[in-house]
């Protein structure tokens, strides 16, 4: 079970130049494909005069949703090296965009691979990397007389309280590290009037 993952906390910018071609790299924390589409549209608009706007992203704690795009560069010379930097740093929930201004000299496939890899690496180096926990949200409904027992378990296990309502039937929404979720569910479900 994946319990934690690495992502970037802050944006990072990188730069690489080779034979008068300029590579501007931007790393962003993202959590949805919609965020990615919005950011890409903004970069294409802002750098409308650039030859290529290549990118790669990785989403989710399991790192199963990803994509690499060469945007007209020779196949696998731009998106794959960018994605390779994401993988080698074991990051997720990240988008790296590399904007290329053509300098008039062809770099060849190996030159392009190095340039996109180095630009992406520089963007990651200028971003703050953090480790986050994978959390699970638990909703528990209970009768009011069980309040003290529920709150004792909450105090002991220290989940984050998202919301709580108190009435004849009470409800509490908790967020806890995924590896501890089953234990919390078990302890709550074993409560009874005594």
Predicted regions and their residues:
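Terminal, non-globular segments
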Residues: 174, 180-183
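N-terminal positively charged helical leader segments and presequences
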Residues: 168-169
């Amino acid at each position: 079970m994946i319990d934690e993952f690495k992502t970037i906390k802050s944006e990072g910018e990188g730069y690489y130049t080779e034979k008068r071609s300029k590579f501007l790299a931007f790393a962003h924390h993202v959590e949805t494909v919609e965020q990615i589409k919005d950011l890409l549209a903004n970069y294409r608009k802002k750098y409308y005069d650039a030859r290529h706007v290549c990118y790669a992203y990785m989403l989710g704690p399991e790192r199963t949703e990803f994509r690499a795009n060469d945007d007209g560069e020779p196949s696998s010379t731009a998106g794959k090296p960018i994605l390779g930097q994401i993988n080698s740093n074991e990051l997720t929930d990240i988008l790296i965009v590399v904007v290329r201004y053509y300098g008039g000299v062809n770099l060849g496939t190996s030159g392009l691979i190095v340039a996109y890899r180095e630009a992406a690496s520089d963007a990651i180096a200028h971003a703050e990397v953090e480790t986050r926990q994978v959390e699970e949200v638990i909703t528990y409904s209970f009768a009011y007389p069980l309040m003290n027992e529920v709150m004792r378990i909450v105090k002991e296990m220290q989940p984050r309280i998202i919301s709580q309502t108190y009435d004849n039937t009470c409800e509490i929404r908790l967020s806890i590290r995924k590896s501890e979720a089953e234990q919390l569910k078990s302890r709550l479900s074993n409560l009874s009037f005594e």
